[in-house]
């Protein structure tokens, strides 16, 4: 019984050391290279390793040469069994105001080995709240949107892609 306890303690120490010394910055830059063919670029950011995570401060997000947003901070937590990307409050670029209200309070993307077939997404802001899942096996996306009064007044064209629910919200379902 004592040796089992020692074995588990050493396994935990080994796992913590792997997480701490994981080359997070090079992995981040490889991820950026993977996004480039999709025309998604994050520029002028400052990347810092926080030990068990990665912090990206500042930066401008572009999609197909169009400025989408000015980001204040992203926190990436790659813990192997539980991975999280937390996006701090940010403002959309002036060109995006016809698509969404300007301020996003925050967003979170979570992947866990305890639910390996789904990625959870949650966001909130002047547009309301959004929560959903992305299915990795069935390749389906499902998002529920509770729109704010400001979004209802704006009536962006993309809201027509959502189906109205009985609760007064909207649902988007699609395959990819």
Which residues make up each language-model segment?
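Hydrophobic membrane-insertion alpha-helices, especially the h-region
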Residues: 2-21
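Generic, well-ordered alpha-helical segments
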Residues: 19, 23, 66-68
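Alpha-helical transmembrane signal-anchor/signal-peptide segments
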Residues: 23-40
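N-terminal beta-strand/beta-hairpin edge segment
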Residues: 39-117, 122, 126-128, 146
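Extracytoplasmic/periplasmic C-terminal soluble domains
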Residues: 129-176
